[in-house]
Protein backbone atom coordinates (compact mmCIF):
# COMPACT_ATOMS: atom_id res chain seq x y z
CA UNK A 1 0.00 0.00 0.00
CA UNK A 2 1.23 3.51 -0.74
CA UNK A 3 1.00 6.06 2.05
CA UNK A 4 1.35 9.84 2.03
CA UNK A 5 4.86 11.11 2.79
CA UNK A 6 5.49 13.77 5.43
CA UNK A 7 8.79 15.52 4.58
CA UNK A 8 7.83 18.51 6.71
CA UNK A 9 7.71 16.32 9.80
CA UNK A 10 11.08 14.79 9.06
CA UNK A 11 12.52 18.31 8.64
CA UNK A 12 10.93 19.46 11.87
CA UNK A 13 12.29 16.46 13.67
CA UNK A 14 15.78 17.15 12.35
CA UNK A 15 15.55 20.76 13.51
CA UNK A 16 14.37 19.62 16.93
CA UNK A 17 17.25 17.19 17.20
CA UNK A 18 19.78 19.92 16.35
CA UNK A 19 18.20 22.30 18.86
CA UNK A 20 18.33 19.75 21.67
CA UNK A 21 21.99 19.10 20.94
CA UNK A 22 22.83 22.80 20.98
CA UNK A 23 21.13 23.38 24.36
CA UNK A 24 22.49 20.33 26.05
CA UNK A 25 25.20 22.33 27.86
CA UNK A 26 22.51 24.10 29.83
CA UNK A 27 20.52 21.07 30.94
CA UNK A 28 20.88 19.39 34.28
CA UNK A 29 22.58 16.29 32.96
CA UNK A 30 19.48 14.18 32.23
CA UNK A 31 19.85 11.23 29.86
CA UNK A 32 17.13 12.44 27.38
CA UNK A 33 14.82 10.18 25.36
CA UNK A 34 16.00 6.72 24.41
CA UNK A 35 17.06 6.15 20.81
CA UNK A 36 14.41 4.04 19.03
CA UNK A 37 15.62 0.70 17.75
CA UNK A 38 16.11 0.02 14.05
CA UNK A 39 13.15 -1.59 12.30
CA UNK A 40 13.68 -5.26 11.59
CA UNK A 41 12.72 -7.55 8.72
CA UNK A 42 12.86 -4.87 6.04
CA UNK A 43 11.73 -6.47 2.78
CA UNK A 44 10.72 -5.56 -0.77
CA UNK A 45 7.86 -7.97 -1.51
CA UNK A 46 6.84 -6.30 -4.78
CA UNK A 47 9.15 -4.81 -7.38
CA UNK A 48 8.15 -3.64 -10.87
CA UNK A 49 9.92 -1.62 -13.52
CA UNK A 50 8.43 1.56 -12.01
CA UNK A 51 8.00 0.92 -8.29
CA UNK A 52 9.42 -0.74 -5.17
CA UNK A 53 7.09 -1.72 -2.31
CA UNK A 54 8.73 -2.02 1.13
CA UNK A 55 7.52 -3.48 4.43
CA UNK A 56 9.09 -3.92 7.88
CA UNK A 57 8.21 -4.88 11.43
CA UNK A 58 6.46 -2.20 13.50
CA UNK A 59 8.51 -0.32 16.11
CA UNK A 60 6.53 0.27 19.31
CA UNK A 61 5.44 3.88 19.70
CA UNK A 62 6.60 5.00 16.26
CA UNK A 63 4.89 8.15 14.97
CA UNK A 64 6.40 7.89 11.51
CA UNK A 65 9.20 6.11 9.73
CA UNK A 66 11.94 7.62 7.61
CA UNK A 67 12.60 5.67 4.41
CA UNK A 68 15.86 6.44 2.66
CA UNK A 69 17.20 5.29 -0.66
CA UNK A 70 20.70 5.12 -2.08
CA UNK A 71 21.55 4.45 -5.69
CA UNK A 72 24.24 1.77 -5.58
CA UNK A 73 27.43 3.70 -6.21
CA UNK A 74 30.53 2.71 -8.12
CA UNK A 75 33.91 2.70 -6.33
CA UNK A 76 35.84 5.97 -6.53
CA UNK A 77 39.53 6.73 -5.88
CA UNK A 78 40.31 8.98 -2.91
CA UNK A 79 44.03 9.65 -2.91
CA UNK A 80 45.66 6.25 -3.05
CA UNK A 81 42.66 4.47 -1.56
CA UNK A 82 39.63 2.93 -3.25
CA UNK A 83 36.40 3.72 -1.46
CA UNK A 84 32.66 3.94 -2.06
CA UNK A 85 30.70 7.10 -1.45
CA UNK A 86 27.32 6.30 0.10
CA UNK A 87 24.68 9.00 -0.10
CA UNK A 88 21.18 8.22 1.13
CA UNK A 89 18.22 10.50 0.51
CA UNK A 90 14.83 10.46 2.16
CA UNK A 91 12.10 9.29 -0.21
CA UNK A 92 9.21 8.91 2.23
CA UNK A 93 7.97 9.31 5.81
CA UNK A 94 5.00 6.96 6.12
CA UNK A 95 2.96 6.62 9.29
CA UNK A 96 2.76 2.84 9.04
CA UNK A 97 5.18 0.04 8.33
CA UNK A 98 4.80 0.06 4.52
CA UNK A 99 5.84 2.36 1.71
CA UNK A 100 5.88 2.29 -2.10
CA UNK A 101 8.59 4.20 -3.92
CA UNK A 102 7.30 5.21 -7.35
CA UNK A 103 10.28 7.32 -8.38
CA UNK A 104 12.58 4.47 -9.40
CA UNK A 105 14.21 3.97 -12.78
CA UNK A 106 14.16 0.63 -14.53
CA UNK A 107 17.45 -1.19 -14.81
CA UNK A 108 18.82 0.36 -11.58
CA UNK A 109 20.03 -1.15 -8.29
CA UNK A 110 19.00 0.64 -5.08
CA UNK A 111 19.73 0.25 -1.35
CA UNK A 112 16.94 1.04 1.12
CA UNK A 113 17.03 1.63 4.89
CA UNK A 114 14.35 2.58 7.41
CA UNK A 115 14.40 4.37 10.79
CA UNK A 116 11.58 4.90 13.28
CA UNK A 117 10.69 8.23 14.89
CA UNK A 118 9.28 7.97 18.41
CA UNK A 119 8.20 11.09 20.30
CA UNK A 120 10.27 13.25 17.99
CA UNK A 121 13.43 11.17 18.22
CA UNK A 122 14.74 9.46 15.10
CA UNK A 123 16.21 6.07 15.76
CA UNK A 124 18.90 3.96 14.23
CA UNK A 125 18.58 3.01 10.57
CA UNK A 126 18.13 -0.59 9.58
CA UNK A 127 20.80 -2.46 7.69
CA UNK A 128 20.36 -1.48 4.00
CA UNK A 129 18.75 -4.01 1.69
CA UNK A 130 19.55 -4.16 -2.01
CA UNK A 131 16.71 -4.02 -4.55
CA UNK A 132 17.23 -4.52 -8.27
CA UNK A 133 14.62 -2.82 -10.43
CA UNK A 134 14.19 -4.60 -13.74
CA UNK A 135 14.56 -2.75 -16.99
CA UNK A 136 11.08 -3.78 -18.15
CA UNK A 137 10.17 -4.85 -21.65
CA UNK A 138 12.34 -3.46 -24.39
CA UNK A 139 10.68 -2.36 -27.61
CA UNK A 140 12.65 -1.87 -30.81
CA UNK A 141 11.04 -0.10 -33.76
CA UNK A 142 12.11 -1.51 -37.13
CA UNK A 143 11.23 1.09 -39.74
CA UNK A 144 13.79 0.60 -42.49
CA UNK A 145 15.08 -2.26 -44.60
CA UNK A 146 17.64 -4.63 -43.10
CA UNK A 147 20.61 -4.61 -45.47
CA UNK A 148 23.31 -6.00 -43.18
CA UNK A 149 23.31 -8.98 -40.82
CA UNK A 150 21.19 -8.32 -37.75
CA UNK A 151 19.94 -10.24 -34.72
CA UNK A 152 16.56 -9.90 -33.02
CA UNK A 153 17.06 -10.71 -29.32
CA UNK A 154 14.58 -12.47 -27.07
CA UNK A 155 14.65 -9.73 -24.41
CA UNK A 156 13.06 -7.25 -26.81
CA UNK A 157 9.84 -6.92 -28.78
CA UNK A 158 10.38 -5.80 -32.37
CA UNK A 159 7.71 -3.70 -34.08
CA UNK A 160 7.70 -3.72 -37.88
CA UNK A 161 6.62 -0.28 -39.07
CA UNK A 162 5.77 -0.53 -42.75
CA UNK A 163 7.05 -3.08 -45.25
CA UNK A 164 10.48 -4.20 -44.06
CA UNK A 165 12.77 -6.09 -46.43
CA UNK A 166 15.79 -8.19 -45.52
CA UNK A 167 17.84 -7.44 -48.61
CA UNK A 168 21.30 -7.04 -50.08
CA UNK A 169 22.35 -10.56 -49.06
CA UNK A 170 21.79 -9.89 -45.35
CA UNK A 171 20.82 -12.54 -42.81
CA UNK A 172 18.29 -11.87 -40.07
CA UNK A 173 18.91 -14.02 -36.98
CA UNK A 174 16.04 -14.35 -34.49
CA UNK A 175 16.59 -15.84 -31.04
CA UNK A 176 14.20 -18.40 -29.51
CA UNK A 177 11.37 -16.73 -27.61
CA UNK A 178 11.47 -13.47 -29.56
CA UNK A 179 8.24 -11.61 -30.37
CA UNK A 180 7.87 -9.61 -33.58
CA UNK A 181 4.80 -7.41 -34.04
CA UNK A 182 3.33 -5.58 -37.00
CA UNK A 183 2.62 -1.89 -36.44
CA UNK A 184 -1.15 -1.62 -36.14
CA UNK A 185 -1.14 2.00 -37.29
CA UNK A 186 0.61 1.15 -40.57
CA UNK A 187 -1.77 -1.27 -42.27
CA UNK A 188 -0.07 -4.29 -43.79
CA UNK A 189 3.27 -3.91 -42.00
CA UNK A 190 5.24 -7.01 -42.98
CA UNK A 191 8.61 -8.71 -43.04
CA UNK A 192 10.04 -9.75 -46.42
CA UNK A 193 13.14 -11.89 -46.85
CA UNK A 194 14.19 -11.18 -50.42
CA UNK A 195 16.07 -13.33 -52.91
CA UNK A 196 19.69 -13.79 -51.87
CA UNK A 197 19.01 -12.92 -48.23
CA UNK A 198 18.22 -15.27 -45.35
CA UNK A 199 16.23 -15.65 -42.17
CA UNK A 200 17.48 -17.87 -39.36
CA UNK A 201 14.54 -18.17 -36.98
CA UNK A 202 15.04 -21.32 -34.92
CA UNK A 203 12.84 -21.34 -31.85
CA UNK A 204 12.14 -24.25 -29.53
CA UNK A 205 8.94 -25.91 -28.34
CA UNK A 206 9.38 -24.12 -25.01
CA UNK A 207 10.35 -20.79 -26.59
CA UNK A 208 8.76 -20.40 -30.03
CA UNK A 209 9.35 -17.32 -32.14
CA UNK A 210 6.08 -15.41 -32.55
CA UNK A 211 5.05 -12.99 -35.30
CA UNK A 212 1.83 -11.36 -34.17
CA UNK A 213 -0.45 -8.36 -33.82
CA UNK A 214 0.59 -5.28 -31.89
CA UNK A 215 -2.83 -5.24 -30.25
CA UNK A 216 -3.46 -6.70 -26.81
CA UNK A 217 -4.98 -10.13 -26.38
CA UNK A 218 -8.73 -9.84 -26.70
CA UNK A 219 -8.46 -7.05 -29.29
CA UNK A 220 -6.59 -8.85 -32.08
CA UNK A 221 -8.16 -9.56 -35.47
CA UNK A 222 -7.20 -11.17 -38.75
CA UNK A 223 -5.44 -8.54 -40.85
CA UNK A 224 -3.92 -6.59 -37.95
CA UNK A 225 -0.61 -6.67 -39.85
CA UNK A 226 0.72 -8.15 -43.09
CA UNK A 227 2.71 -11.34 -42.75
CA UNK A 228 6.01 -13.12 -43.26
CA UNK A 229 7.16 -13.43 -46.87
CA UNK A 230 10.19 -15.35 -48.14
CA UNK A 231 11.37 -14.97 -51.74
CA UNK A 232 13.92 -17.46 -53.03
CA UNK A 233 15.71 -18.28 -56.26
CA UNK A 234 13.58 -21.29 -57.13
CA UNK A 235 11.72 -22.05 -60.34
CA UNK A 236 8.15 -21.03 -61.15
CA UNK A 237 6.08 -21.83 -64.24
CA UNK A 238 5.25 -18.22 -65.11
CA UNK A 239 7.49 -15.94 -67.14
CA UNK A 240 8.09 -12.56 -65.65
CA UNK A 241 8.30 -10.13 -64.30
CA UNK A 242 5.74 -11.54 -61.88
CA UNK A 243 4.94 -9.19 -59.00
CA UNK A 244 4.12 -10.79 -55.68
CA UNK A 245 0.51 -10.43 -54.59
CA UNK A 246 -0.01 -7.64 -52.09
CA UNK A 247 3.12 -5.70 -53.06
CA UNK A 248 3.53 -2.64 -55.26
CA UNK A 249 1.21 -0.17 -53.55
CA UNK A 250 4.29 2.05 -53.14
CA UNK A 251 3.16 3.23 -49.73
CA UNK A 252 5.10 2.67 -46.52
CA UNK A 253 7.99 1.10 -48.46
CA UNK A 254 5.71 -1.45 -50.17
CA UNK A 255 7.52 -1.55 -53.49
CA UNK A 256 6.89 -4.26 -56.13
CA UNK A 257 8.62 -7.58 -55.43
CA UNK A 258 9.36 -9.68 -58.52
CA UNK A 259 9.84 -13.38 -57.79
CA UNK A 260 10.14 -14.71 -61.34
CA UNK A 261 13.32 -15.77 -63.10
CA UNK A 262 14.84 -18.04 -60.47
CA UNK A 263 16.69 -21.16 -61.59
CA UNK A 264 17.77 -22.95 -58.40
CA UNK A 265 15.20 -25.16 -56.69
CA UNK A 266 17.85 -26.11 -54.12
CA UNK A 267 18.26 -22.49 -53.00
CA UNK A 268 18.61 -21.85 -49.26
CA UNK A 269 16.67 -18.96 -47.70
CA UNK A 270 17.34 -20.01 -44.11
CA UNK A 271 15.31 -21.65 -41.34
CA UNK A 272 11.88 -21.41 -39.75
CA UNK A 273 11.55 -23.79 -36.82
CA UNK A 274 9.05 -23.50 -33.98
CA UNK A 275 7.52 -20.31 -35.34
CA UNK A 276 3.98 -18.93 -34.99
CA UNK A 277 2.45 -16.35 -37.33
CA UNK A 278 -0.72 -14.83 -35.87
CA UNK A 279 -3.46 -12.40 -37.00
CA UNK A 280 -1.75 -11.41 -40.25
CA UNK A 281 -2.91 -10.89 -43.81
CA UNK A 282 -3.20 -7.83 -46.02
CA UNK A 283 -5.19 -7.45 -49.20
CA UNK A 284 -5.01 -4.12 -51.03
CA UNK A 285 -6.90 -5.73 -53.93
CA UNK A 286 -9.19 -8.73 -54.36
CA UNK A 287 -7.09 -11.85 -55.13
CA UNK A 288 -3.89 -9.92 -54.40
CA UNK A 289 -3.20 -10.57 -50.74
CA UNK A 290 -0.32 -11.22 -48.42
CA UNK A 291 -0.74 -14.42 -46.44
CA UNK A 292 0.34 -15.56 -43.02
CA UNK A 293 3.42 -17.26 -44.48
CA UNK A 294 4.15 -16.73 -48.16
CA UNK A 295 6.91 -18.76 -49.83
CA UNK A 296 7.65 -17.53 -53.34
CA UNK A 297 10.16 -19.57 -55.34
CA UNK A 298 11.74 -20.87 -52.12
CA UNK A 299 14.26 -23.66 -52.61
CA UNK A 300 14.72 -27.00 -50.88
CA UNK A 301 17.81 -25.83 -49.03
CA UNK A 302 15.46 -23.89 -46.75
CA UNK A 303 14.17 -25.55 -43.56
CA UNK A 304 10.47 -25.14 -42.68
CA UNK A 305 9.25 -27.20 -39.72
CA UNK A 306 7.05 -26.75 -36.69
CA UNK A 307 5.26 -23.67 -38.00
CA UNK A 308 1.74 -22.53 -37.13
CA UNK A 309 -0.36 -19.85 -38.80
CA UNK A 310 -3.25 -18.59 -36.70
CA UNK A 311 -6.28 -16.55 -37.86
CA UNK A 312 -4.84 -14.88 -40.93
CA UNK A 313 -6.90 -12.74 -43.28
CA UNK A 314 -6.01 -14.79 -46.37
CA UNK A 315 -4.22 -18.13 -46.81
CA UNK A 316 -2.28 -19.58 -43.92
CA UNK A 317 0.51 -21.15 -46.00
CA UNK A 318 1.02 -20.34 -49.68
CA UNK A 319 3.70 -21.65 -52.01
CA UNK A 320 4.38 -20.07 -55.39
CA UNK A 321 6.73 -22.42 -57.22
CA UNK A 322 10.03 -23.48 -55.74
CA UNK A 323 10.68 -26.80 -54.02
CA UNK A 324 11.01 -26.15 -50.29
CA UNK A 325 10.03 -29.12 -48.11
CA UNK A 326 8.06 -28.69 -44.88
CA UNK A 327 7.10 -30.76 -41.85
CA UNK A 328 4.84 -30.29 -38.85
CA UNK A 329 2.54 -27.48 -39.98
CA UNK A 330 -0.60 -26.26 -38.20
CA UNK A 331 -3.18 -23.92 -39.68
CA UNK A 332 -5.91 -22.68 -37.37
CA UNK A 333 -9.02 -20.72 -38.45
CA UNK A 334 -7.85 -19.39 -41.81
CA UNK A 335 -9.47 -16.48 -43.62
CA UNK A 336 -9.06 -18.34 -46.92
CA UNK A 337 -7.20 -21.55 -47.77
CA UNK A 338 -5.10 -23.37 -45.22
CA UNK A 339 -2.58 -24.78 -47.72
CA UNK A 340 -2.34 -23.20 -51.19
CA UNK A 341 0.22 -24.46 -53.75
CA UNK A 342 0.66 -23.25 -57.30
CA UNK A 343 2.97 -22.10 -60.12
CA UNK A 344 5.11 -25.21 -60.23
CA UNK A 345 5.60 -25.87 -56.53
CA UNK A 346 7.43 -29.19 -56.24
CA UNK A 347 8.20 -29.60 -52.54
CA UNK A 348 7.30 -32.35 -50.09
CA UNK A 349 5.12 -31.76 -47.04
CA UNK A 350 4.55 -34.27 -44.25
CA UNK A 351 2.45 -33.90 -41.08
CA UNK A 352 0.07 -31.01 -41.66
CA UNK A 353 -3.04 -30.06 -39.68
CA UNK A 354 -5.80 -27.65 -40.71
CA UNK A 355 -8.75 -26.73 -38.50
CA UNK A 356 -11.72 -24.50 -39.30
CA UNK A 357 -14.85 -23.85 -37.24
CA UNK A 358 -15.84 -20.32 -38.27
CA UNK A 359 -15.10 -17.38 -40.53
CA UNK A 360 -12.55 -15.24 -38.65
CA UNK A 361 -13.51 -11.66 -37.87
CA UNK A 362 -11.19 -9.36 -39.78
CA UNK A 363 -9.83 -5.92 -39.17
CA UNK A 364 -11.75 -3.30 -41.18
CA UNK A 365 -9.75 -1.88 -44.06
CA UNK A 366 -7.20 -4.69 -44.21
CA UNK A 367 -8.68 -6.52 -47.18
CA UNK A 368 -11.56 -8.58 -48.44
CA UNK A 369 -13.08 -11.76 -47.10
CA UNK A 370 -12.53 -14.83 -49.27
CA UNK A 371 -15.36 -16.22 -51.35
CA UNK A 372 -13.89 -19.70 -51.79
CA UNK A 373 -12.01 -20.91 -48.70
CA UNK A 374 -10.77 -24.51 -48.84
CA UNK A 375 -8.41 -26.58 -46.74
CA UNK A 376 -6.15 -27.42 -49.70
CA UNK A 377 -6.34 -25.44 -52.94
CA UNK A 378 -3.76 -26.33 -55.57
CA UNK A 379 -3.41 -24.76 -59.00
CA UNK A 380 -1.15 -25.49 -61.92
CA UNK A 381 -0.64 -22.19 -63.70
CA UNK A 382 -3.05 -19.29 -63.93
CA UNK A 383 -2.82 -15.66 -64.98
CA UNK A 384 -0.23 -13.65 -66.88
CA UNK A 385 2.98 -15.43 -67.82
CA UNK A 386 1.46 -18.92 -68.22
CA UNK A 387 2.69 -19.49 -71.77
CA UNK A 388 0.72 -22.73 -72.19
CA UNK A 389 -2.15 -21.79 -69.93
CA UNK A 390 -3.00 -24.48 -67.40
CA UNK A 391 -0.60 -26.84 -69.21
CA UNK A 392 2.44 -24.65 -68.44
CA UNK A 393 5.41 -26.45 -66.99
CA UNK A 394 6.87 -27.34 -64.62
CA UNK A 395 3.61 -28.64 -63.22
CA UNK A 396 2.65 -27.97 -59.64
CA UNK A 397 3.58 -31.39 -58.26
CA UNK A 398 3.93 -31.57 -54.48
CA UNK A 399 3.87 -34.62 -52.27
CA UNK A 400 1.46 -34.05 -49.37
CA UNK A 401 1.60 -36.91 -46.88
CA UNK A 402 -0.03 -37.41 -43.48
CA UNK A 403 -2.43 -34.51 -43.53
CA UNK A 404 -5.44 -33.89 -41.29
CA UNK A 405 -8.03 -31.46 -42.65
CA UNK A 406 -11.04 -30.53 -40.51
CA UNK A 407 -13.67 -28.18 -41.87
CA UNK A 408 -16.49 -26.22 -40.23
CA UNK A 409 -19.92 -27.47 -39.28
CA UNK A 410 -22.73 -27.28 -41.81
CA UNK A 411 -23.85 -23.77 -42.69
CA UNK A 412 -20.67 -21.88 -41.80
CA UNK A 413 -19.64 -21.35 -45.43
CA UNK A 414 -22.95 -20.33 -46.96
CA UNK A 415 -21.81 -18.38 -50.01
CA UNK A 416 -19.25 -18.68 -52.77
CA UNK A 417 -17.52 -21.79 -54.00
CA UNK A 418 -15.64 -22.68 -50.84
CA UNK A 419 -16.06 -25.40 -48.30
CA UNK A 420 -14.28 -28.37 -49.90
CA UNK A 421 -11.56 -30.40 -48.27
CA UNK A 422 -9.26 -30.45 -51.29
CA UNK A 423 -9.59 -28.49 -54.54
CA UNK A 424 -7.19 -29.60 -57.29
CA UNK A 425 -7.49 -27.56 -60.47
CA UNK A 426 -5.93 -25.64 -63.37
CA UNK A 427 -3.66 -28.46 -64.41
CA UNK A 428 -2.14 -29.27 -61.05
CA UNK A 429 -0.40 -32.57 -60.45
CA UNK A 430 0.88 -33.98 -57.17
CA UNK A 431 0.65 -36.92 -54.80
CA UNK A 432 -1.73 -36.81 -51.84
CA UNK A 433 -1.39 -39.81 -49.58
CA UNK A 434 -2.10 -41.09 -46.06
CA UNK A 435 -4.53 -38.31 -45.20
CA UNK A 436 -7.69 -37.65 -43.22
CA UNK A 437 -10.40 -35.27 -44.46
CA UNK A 438 -13.29 -34.54 -42.09
CA UNK A 439 -16.41 -32.38 -41.77
CA UNK A 440 -16.87 -30.80 -45.18
CA UNK A 441 -20.51 -30.17 -46.00
CA UNK A 442 -20.05 -30.16 -49.79
CA UNK A 443 -17.43 -32.81 -50.55
CA UNK A 444 -14.03 -34.08 -49.54
CA UNK A 445 -12.41 -33.75 -52.98
CA UNK A 446 -13.05 -31.43 -55.93
CA UNK A 447 -11.01 -32.13 -59.09
CA UNK A 448 -11.75 -29.51 -61.71
CA UNK A 449 -11.09 -28.94 -65.44
CA UNK A 450 -9.78 -31.14 -68.22
CA UNK A 451 -6.12 -30.22 -67.79
CA UNK A 452 -6.26 -31.57 -64.25
CA UNK A 453 -7.89 -34.72 -65.66
CA UNK A 454 -4.85 -35.04 -67.94
CA UNK A 455 -2.62 -35.17 -64.86
CA UNK A 456 -4.80 -37.94 -63.45
CA UNK A 457 -4.53 -39.78 -66.73
CA UNK A 458 -0.75 -39.66 -66.97
CA UNK A 459 -0.22 -40.67 -63.32
CA UNK A 460 1.30 -37.39 -62.16
CA UNK A 461 -1.75 -36.72 -59.95
CA UNK A 462 -2.60 -39.42 -57.41
CA UNK A 463 -4.96 -39.32 -54.44
CA UNK A 464 -4.52 -42.46 -52.36
CA UNK A 465 -5.01 -43.98 -48.89
CA UNK A 466 -7.16 -41.17 -47.47
CA UNK A 467 -10.01 -41.43 -44.93
CA UNK A 468 -13.01 -39.10 -45.21
CA UNK A 469 -15.44 -38.58 -42.33
CA UNK A 470 -18.62 -36.52 -42.04
CA UNK A 471 -18.53 -35.17 -45.60
CA UNK A 472 -21.37 -34.45 -47.99
CA UNK A 473 -19.77 -36.59 -50.68
CA UNK A 474 -16.40 -38.04 -51.50
CA UNK A 475 -16.09 -36.28 -54.87
CA UNK A 476 -17.56 -32.98 -56.03
CA UNK A 477 -20.15 -33.99 -58.61
CA UNK A 478 -20.26 -32.49 -62.08
CA UNK A 479 -16.57 -31.61 -62.31
CA UNK A 480 -14.32 -32.60 -65.22
CA UNK A 481 -11.08 -33.11 -63.35
CA UNK A 482 -11.49 -36.84 -62.93
CA UNK A 483 -11.94 -39.13 -59.96
CA UNK A 484 -10.20 -42.08 -58.35
CA UNK A 485 -11.78 -45.44 -57.66
CA UNK A 486 -12.15 -45.62 -53.86
CA UNK A 487 -11.36 -49.32 -53.75
CA UNK A 488 -8.28 -49.19 -55.96
CA UNK A 489 -6.86 -46.12 -54.24
CA UNK A 490 -7.96 -46.91 -50.66
CA UNK A 491 -10.16 -43.84 -50.28
CA UNK A 492 -12.05 -44.94 -47.20
CA UNK A 493 -15.36 -43.41 -46.09
CA UNK A 494 -15.81 -43.47 -42.32
CA UNK A 495 -19.06 -43.86 -40.42
CA UNK A 496 -17.65 -41.77 -37.56
CA UNK A 497 -18.29 -38.09 -37.04
CA UNK A 498 -15.34 -35.73 -37.08
CA UNK A 499 -15.53 -35.36 -33.30
CA UNK A 500 -15.49 -39.13 -32.81
CA UNK A 501 -12.52 -39.52 -35.15
CA UNK A 502 -10.06 -37.87 -32.73
CA UNK A 503 -9.34 -38.18 -29.03
CA UNK A 504 -10.42 -34.54 -28.54
CA UNK A 505 -11.98 -32.18 -31.07
CA UNK A 506 -13.85 -29.41 -29.23
CA UNK A 507 -16.40 -27.24 -30.98
CA UNK A 508 -14.98 -24.01 -29.52
CA UNK A 509 -11.37 -24.59 -28.52
CA UNK A 510 -9.74 -22.09 -26.24
CA UNK A 511 -6.32 -23.60 -25.63
CA UNK A 512 -3.84 -26.03 -27.10
CA UNK A 513 -4.74 -28.52 -24.41
CA UNK A 514 -8.29 -28.72 -25.76
CA UNK A 515 -7.11 -30.55 -28.88
CA UNK A 516 -5.83 -34.05 -29.27
CA UNK A 517 -5.39 -34.87 -32.94
CA UNK A 518 -4.53 -38.48 -32.18
CA UNK A 519 -6.99 -40.77 -34.01
CA UNK A 520 -9.42 -42.42 -31.63
CA UNK A 521 -9.59 -46.16 -31.20
CA UNK A 522 -11.87 -47.51 -33.90
CA UNK A 523 -11.07 -44.75 -36.35
CA UNK A 524 -10.02 -45.92 -39.81
CA UNK A 525 -7.14 -43.45 -39.53
CA UNK A 526 -5.30 -45.71 -37.08
CA UNK A 527 -4.40 -48.03 -39.94
CA UNK A 528 -4.60 -48.33 -43.71
CA UNK A 529 -1.72 -46.05 -44.66
CA UNK A 530 0.38 -46.69 -47.75
CA UNK A 531 3.51 -48.35 -46.41
CA UNK A 532 5.83 -48.85 -48.13
CA UNK A 533 5.46 -46.24 -50.83
CA UNK A 534 5.44 -47.47 -54.40
CA UNK A 535 5.82 -46.14 -57.92
CA UNK A 536 5.83 -42.38 -58.49
CA UNK A 537 5.12 -41.70 -54.83
CA UNK A 538 8.21 -43.65 -53.76
CA UNK A 539 10.33 -41.73 -56.24
CA UNK A 540 8.95 -38.38 -55.13
CA UNK A 541 9.30 -39.11 -51.42
CA UNK A 542 12.99 -39.90 -51.55
CA UNK A 543 14.51 -39.69 -48.08
CA UNK A 544 12.42 -36.67 -47.08
CA UNK A 545 9.07 -38.37 -46.43
CA UNK A 546 8.49 -41.52 -44.39
CA UNK A 547 5.74 -44.00 -45.24
CA UNK A 548 3.35 -44.70 -42.35
CA UNK A 549 0.82 -47.42 -41.62
CA UNK A 550 -1.60 -44.85 -40.18
CA UNK A 551 -3.44 -42.02 -41.92
CA UNK A 552 -3.58 -38.41 -40.86
CA UNK A 553 -1.02 -36.12 -39.28
CA UNK A 554 -0.57 -37.91 -35.97
CA UNK A 555 0.76 -41.35 -35.09
CA UNK A 556 -1.67 -43.19 -32.77
CA UNK A 557 1.37 -44.17 -30.70
CA UNK A 558 2.64 -40.56 -30.46
CA UNK A 559 4.33 -38.17 -30.22
CA UNK A 560 1.88 -35.29 -29.87
CA UNK A 561 4.11 -33.04 -31.90
CA UNK A 562 1.81 -30.00 -31.93
CA UNK A 563 1.84 -29.52 -28.14
CA UNK A 564 3.70 -26.83 -26.16
CA UNK A 565 4.43 -24.42 -29.02
CA UNK A 566 1.06 -23.85 -30.76
CA UNK A 567 -1.66 -21.40 -29.67
CA UNK A 568 -5.42 -21.19 -30.17
CA UNK A 569 -7.14 -17.84 -29.63
CA UNK A 570 -10.12 -15.99 -31.05
CA UNK A 571 -8.62 -12.55 -30.63
Predicted regions and their residues:
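Recognizes extended acidic, P/S/T-rich segments that occur
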Residues: 66-107, 119-120, 124
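Pro/Thr/Ser/Gly-rich low-complexity, intrinsically disordered linker/stalk tracts
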Residues: 25-61, 106, 118-135
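Bacterial N-terminal signal peptides that target proteins for export
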Residues: 1-12
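Surface-exposed coil/turn segments at beta-strand junctions on protein surfaces, enriched
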Residues: 47-49, 60, 94, 105-107, ...
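Extracellular beta-rich repeat passengers
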Residues: 136-173, 183-196, 203, 208, ...
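Surface-exposed loop/turn motifs at beta-strand-loop junctions within extracellular Ig-like
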Residues: 116-120, 178, 215
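C-terminal motif of bacterial Sec signal peptides marking the signal peptidase cleavage site
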Residues: 19-22
Amino acid sequence: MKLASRPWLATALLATTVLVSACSDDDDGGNGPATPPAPTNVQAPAVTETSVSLTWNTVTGADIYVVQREVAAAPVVRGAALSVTRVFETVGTPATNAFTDETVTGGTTYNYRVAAVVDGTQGTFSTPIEVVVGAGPKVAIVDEDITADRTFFADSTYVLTGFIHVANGATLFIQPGTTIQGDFEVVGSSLFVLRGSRIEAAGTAEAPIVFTSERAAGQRLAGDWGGLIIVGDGIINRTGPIILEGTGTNTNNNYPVDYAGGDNNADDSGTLRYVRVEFGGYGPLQDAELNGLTMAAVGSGTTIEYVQVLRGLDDSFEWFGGAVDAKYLVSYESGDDHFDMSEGYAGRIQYAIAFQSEVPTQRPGAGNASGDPQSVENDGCNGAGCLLGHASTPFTQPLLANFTLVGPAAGVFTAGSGGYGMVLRRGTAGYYVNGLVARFEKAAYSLRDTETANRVGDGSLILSHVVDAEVGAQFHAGQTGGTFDPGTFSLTPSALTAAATFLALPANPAAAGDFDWTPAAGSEATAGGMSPFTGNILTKAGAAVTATTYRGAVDPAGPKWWTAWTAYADN
